Amino acid sequence: MRLRNGTVATALAFITSFLTLSWYTTWQNGKEKLIAYQREFLALKERLRIAEHRISQRSSELNTIVQQFKRVGAETNGSKDALNKFSDNTLKLLKELTSKKSLQVPSIYYHLPHLLKNEGSLRPAVQIGNGRTGVSIVMGIPTVKREVKSYLIETLHSLIDNLYPEEKLDCVIVVFIGETDTDYVHGVVANLEKEFSKEISSGLVEVISPPESYYPDLTNLKETFGDSKERVRWRTKQNLDYCFLMMYAQEKGIYYIQLEDDIIVKQNYFNTIKNFALQLSSEEWMILEFSQLGFIGKMFQAPDLTLIVEFIFMFYKEKPIDWLLDHILWVKVCNPEKDAKHCDRQKANLRIRFRPSLFQHVGLHSSLSGKIQKLTDKDYMKPLLLKIHVNPPAEVSTSLKVYQGHTLEKTYMGEDFFWAITPIAGDYILFKFDKPVNVESYLFHSGNQEHPGDILLNTTVEVLPFKSEGLEISKETKDKRLEDGYFRIGKFENGVAEGMVDPSLNPISAFRLSVIQNSAVWAILNEIHIKKATK
């Protein structure tokens, strides 16, 4: 009898374990599918946004055509000889369109009038590849003649060899040869076709070069910022090269990332870039930076390229590209009545840096004649000691003593981890928002892989509602109210504080981390995520 009972118990235990394992496997598979669906949804959302932008663009182009017909009508004064090629329906439509009085919008030709002399000025003189479109990421690589050594082949091998087969179908690499010497251009094309014939035929790699008529006269440029005449010419032409490449790439994908012809990349770079962008799909960013050097690894959303190109065309002779990009951000978000720190905080929400860097500069000999540049990205080989999130613009402060420049400001902006000497009771870390924010959740993570023991202990999380009176809150929430108006909503456990914010407390003016007991260890804060509530 005992044996029989034991057998039954064993059988029941086996069945229970089997069912539990089956349930867990089903749940895990379901979770993975959900994550995949979420990524597909975010990608679809981006494509829809780009489609809306392109419809608006086509509307603008149609308006330009109408303006041209108006000029034709005015010049011919309704001459039958000029219009007899059109059908009656077309003539009727033209009459309706041109009869409406409207203002004329300045175009690219206002800043580059020389383009009107040749109708092919904005058409690539050389175009190799099958014209792939509909990809996630377009990589743009401008290249010009170098006196000493070309790094282009090595750069392309690094980019291509670090792509998985499925990733090669979801991107396109556009090589822009910024030269008008046809013999040189054809020589570069021949080398690329020989080295990357498979990649070109598959659509992964495309090669273009501009017509000579695209460039204006660059011989009489004004020397500025102490640059020599040759350097001013070099940087001015470089701005024009970037613009041509961006215009060509704009309609090919969701994102455009600017690269150079003398770099190497990290493994898994494509997936890292794509996932980082999708994580930020609900944020209003303009530039994602995957390298700290110059214009390397700067990624934009395709619709934003229109604004960027227009801005560069307006000032292409005045300043280098990286300065112009910073001016765009300043114009968009900086308040002249506020100080520089406020401006930097606002720009940090549009210009988001990913660490560690995914691209390393390896070129020693610059494309500028005679220039040697020993530039390397110091973040390229660094381990990731902090996790980056986009947080609401805020003024940050702390009573803690900072260690070796690891400031709270840098942590909040995703540039470094915060490191402070032993906290004591009464110390605080304060995040005061520039304007009240509806917050959904929060996450504060202390310690890192190099110093896992430097964590926040006996520390609480507190929020200050924008409205001090008239809050419709539960008794449980009301009991958490402190004398200074803050509400205690959480605390650190094993170095981590994480939780949801009671919606009745929104909008929030500030977050505060308060140390309630002396600590025996130093403190590192390597992750800050104050997640805004979705509308």
From Swiss-Prot:
Residues 28-63 form a coiled coil. GO terms for biological process: glyoxylate metabolic process; N-glycan processing; protein N-linked glycosylation. InterPro entries: Glyco_transf_54, MGAT4_A/B/C_C. The gene is MGAT4A. N-glycosylated. It catalyses: N(4)-{beta-D-GlcNAc-(1->2)-alpha-D-Man-(1->3)-[beta-D-GlcNAc-(1->2)-alpha-D-Man-(1->6)]-beta-D-Man-(1->4)-beta-D-GlcNAc-(1->4)-beta-D-GlcNAc}-L-asparaginyl-[protein] + UDP-N-acetyl-alpha-D-glucosamine = N(4)-{beta-D-GlcNAc-(1->2)-[beta-D-GlcNAc-(1->4)]-alpha-D-Man-(1->3)-[beta-D-GlcNAc-(1->2)-alpha-D-Man-(1->6)]-beta-D-Man-(1->4)-beta-D-GlcNAc-(1->4)-beta-D-GlcNAc}-L-asparaginyl-[protein] + UDP + H(+); an N(4)-{beta-D-GlcNAc-(1->2)-alpha-D-Man-(1->3)-[alpha-D-Man-(1->6)]-beta-D-Man-(1->4)-beta-D-GlcNAc-(1->4)-beta-D-GlcNAc}-L-asparaginyl-[protein] + UDP-N-acetyl-alpha-D-glucosamine = an N(4)-{beta-D-GlcNAc-(1->2)-[beta-D-GlcNAc-(1->4)]-alpha-D-Man-(1->3)-[alpha-D-Man-(1->6)]-beta-D-Man-(1->4)-beta-D-GlcNAc-(1->4)-beta-D-GlcNAc}-L-asparaginyl-[protein] + UDP + H(+); an N(4)-{beta-D-GlcNAc-(1->2)-alpha-D-Man-(1->3)-[beta-D-GlcNAc-(1->2)-[beta-D-GlcNAc-(1->6)]-alpha-D-Man-(1->6)]-beta-D-Man-(1->4)-beta-D-GlcNAc-(1->4)-beta-D-GlcNAc}-L-asparaginyl-[protein] + UDP-N-acetyl-alpha-D-glucosamine = an N(4)-{beta-D-GlcNAc-(1->2)-[beta-D-GlcNAc-(1->4)]-alpha-D-Man-(1->3)-[beta-D-GlcNAc-(1->2)-[beta-D-GlcNAc-(1->6)]-alpha-D-Man-(1->6)]-beta-D-Man-(1->4)-beta-D-GlcNAc-(1->4)-beta-D-GlcNAc}-L-asparaginyl-[protein] + UDP + H(+); an N(4)-{beta-D-GlcNAc-(1->2)-alpha-D-Man-(1->3)-[beta-D-GlcNAc-(1->2)-alpha-D-Man-(1->6)]-beta-D-Man-(1->4)-beta-D-GlcNAc-(1->4)-[alpha-L-Fuc-(1->6)]-beta-D-GlcNAc}-L-asparaginyl-[protein] + UDP-N-acetyl-alpha-D-glucosamine = N(4)-{beta-D-GlcNAc-(1->2)-[beta-D-GlcNAc-(1->4)]-alpha-D-Man-(1->3)-[beta-D-GlcNAc-(1->2)-alpha-D-Man-(1->6)]-beta-D-Man-(1->4)-beta-D-GlcNAc-(1->4)-[alpha-L-Fuc-(1->6)]-beta-D-GlcNAc}-asparaginyl-[protein] + UDP + H(+). GO terms for cellular component: endoplasmic reticulum; endoplasmic reticulum-Golgi intermediate compartment; extracellular region; Golgi membrane; Golgi stack; peroxisome. Inhibited by UDP. Its EC number is 2.4.1.145. Keywords: Coiled coil, Glycoprotein, Glycosyltransferase, Golgi apparatus, Membrane, Metal-binding, Phosphoprotein, Secreted, Signal-anchor, Transferase, Transmembrane, Transmembrane helix. Glycosyltransferase that catalyze the transfer of GlcNAc from UDP-GlcNAc to the GlcNAcbeta1-2Manalpha1-3 arm of the core structure of N-linked glycans through a beta1-4 linkage and participates in the production of tri- and tetra-antennary N-linked sugar chains. Involved in glucose transport by mediating SLC2A2/GLUT2 glycosylation, thereby controlling cell-surface expression of SLC2A2 in pancreatic beta cells. Its cofactor is a divalent metal cation. This is Alpha-1,3-mannosyl-glycoprotein 4-beta-N-acetylglucosaminyltransferase A. Belongs to the glycosyltransferase 54 family. Glycans are attached at N77, N458. It is found in: Golgi apparatus membrane. It is a single-pass type II membrane protein. Pathway: Protein modification; protein glycosylation. The chain crosses the membrane at residues 5-27. Residues 28-535 are lumenal. Residues 1-4 are cytoplasmic. GO terms for molecular function: alanine-glyoxylate transaminase activity; alpha-1,3-mannosylglycoprotein 4-beta-N-acetylglucosaminyltransferase activity; metal ion binding; protein homodimerization activity. The modification Phosphoserine is found at S474. It comes from the Eukaryota. Its main location: Golgi. It comes from Macaca fascicularis.
